[in-house]
Amino acid sequence: MDNYVVLVPGQSEQFLDREETLLWLQSWLNNFDELPYDLACKSSILEASQYLLDTACDLEIKNGFTIQWYAVRLESPDL
């Protein structure tokens, strides 16, 4: 299963699975009046969020405010 750490300026990091990360990205994309140029050609917010998850690791929401996500491996500590 893919896991991601998601970062929002001024907030604590969150660890999400792939589906949760897609929903998280969709919620941010829904706030745009107009999607950025490279996402505007996508047929849906879901397709745009999948494209972002597969090809990028950050998205500028507004000038100076960028969200980030990175794939991580979560492992149980050895005891």
Spans of features found by a protein language model:
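Secondary-structure junction/capping motif
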Residues: 10, 17, 43-44, 71
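Short, hydrophobic/π-rich interface segment
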Residues: 22-56
